[in-house]
Structures are given as C-alpha cells and as structure tokens.
Amino acid sequence: MRAFIVGRFQPFHNGHMEILKRILHENDSVIIGIGSAQFSHTLKDPFTAGERHLMISSALEESGVYNYYLVPIEDVNSNPLWVSHVESLTPPFQRVYTNNPLVKRLFYEKGYEVLSMDLLNRKEWSGTSIRNKMIRGENWKKDVPPAVARVIDEIDGVSRIRDLSESDE
C-alpha cells in the first residue's frame, strides 16, 4: 500500500523522521508532499522547495530509506480543489496520514482512509522551535537528522533565518 503525507518541513526534523519510519512500517512506500512549495525566504517558510527536497532526501537516504516519492505541492486557493490538485501531482495512494483537521476532512470526503499520528517530543521537534533556536544561537542540530544539518550549513540557512528575523515587516 502507498501512503501520503504532506508537511511544510521548515526544516525537516527528527519528529518528521520518526513519523515517516512509522508510516513505512505500515505501508510499502510513502509519498511526501512538500507543502506550500511556492513559499520561501520568510521567517515562517525560510527554505525553498528544492532545499527542503534536498534535506528530506539526504536524511532518508542516510537512514537507508529509499521507498519514498518527494513531490512539491503548491497551495491552491480553493479547498474543495486541493485533493484533486494533489492527486494530479502524485502517484496513486490509498492512505493519508495527517493531524490537520482540514486535510483530514478534505481527504475523507474524497473517500481516502485517513489516519492520525502521535506527535513525538513536540516541544523540541517543531519547525518553529528549531528556527527560534537558530535565531537565538542555541543548539538546534540535535533536533534534526545529521544530513539536514549539513544541508542547512551548506545553504547558510541559519544566517538566512537570522536576517529574516530582523526584518521590520
């Protein structure tokens, strides 16, 4: 069975990795939707879809995980059309994993099996928490897979986030 999960992954962190491992324990493969793919260079969404793709693929491959598809998904300004938009971009799938109430409802109404997940260590493993640690100069690397830390270093991501945090907008 093939599953689908969508997230912003700003950045991809250890909680995401654990969730993907659980999904792959229950399914043959997973489609990972890189959500809000059109956004980057903002404090909430600092990384491009391509950078997030590199973070996720590097982390999964370093962990020996190869049964996945990565698909950038731009937002659509019409909720009833969003599932059809996702379907047009991805291989077929049977299950959806999400804790987002709107995403649950939209896929449920289209007949998908929708499952929730327990979020692990949410205080430490959240994109907001990790980005805030970067701004404050705290240790954020323990909260992301080593491959993700290397990508963020390679693209000078911490400096980007700090610059964005100083914006007056």
From Swiss-Prot:
Enzyme class: transferase
Keyword Ribonucleoprotein among UniProt keywords: no
EC number(s) stated in the UniProt entry for this protein: 2.7.7.1
SUPFAM superfamilies the record matches: Nucleotidylyl transferase
Reactions catalysed according to its record: beta-nicotinamide D-ribonucleotide + ATP + H(+) = diphosphate + NAD(+)
InterPro entries for this protein: Cyt_trans-like (IPR004821), NMN_Atrans_arc (IPR006418), Rossmann-like_a/b/a_fold (IPR014729)
Pathway it works in: Cofactor biosynthesis; NAD(+) biosynthesis; NAD(+) from nicotinamide D-ribonucleotide: step 1/1
Location of this chain's protein in the cell: Cytoplasm
GO MF terms held by the record: ATP binding; nicotinamide-nucleotide adenylyltransferase activity
Transmembrane stretches, start-end: none
Record keywords: ATP-binding, Cytoplasm, NAD, Nucleotide-binding, Nucleotidyltransferase, Pyridine nucleotide biosynthesis, Transferase
Broad class of where this protein is predominantly found: cytoplasm
Top-level division of the source organism's lineage: Archaea
Cross-referenced CDD domains: NMNAT_Archaea
GO biological process terms held by the UniProt record: NAD biosynthetic process
PANTHER family noted in UniProt: BIFUNCTIONAL NMN ADENYLYLTRANSFERASE_NUDIX HYDROLASE, PHOSPHOPANTETHEINE ADENYLYLTRANSFERASE
Family indicated by similarity: Belongs to the archaeal NMN adenylyltransferase family.
Protein name: Nicotinamide-nucleotide adenylyltransferase
Species in which this protein is naturally found: Picrophilus torridus (strain ATCC 700027 / DSM 9790 / JCM 10055 / NBRC 100828 / KAW 2/3)
Taxonomy of the source species: Archaea, Methanobacteriati, Thermoplasmatota, Thermoplasmata, Thermoplasmatales
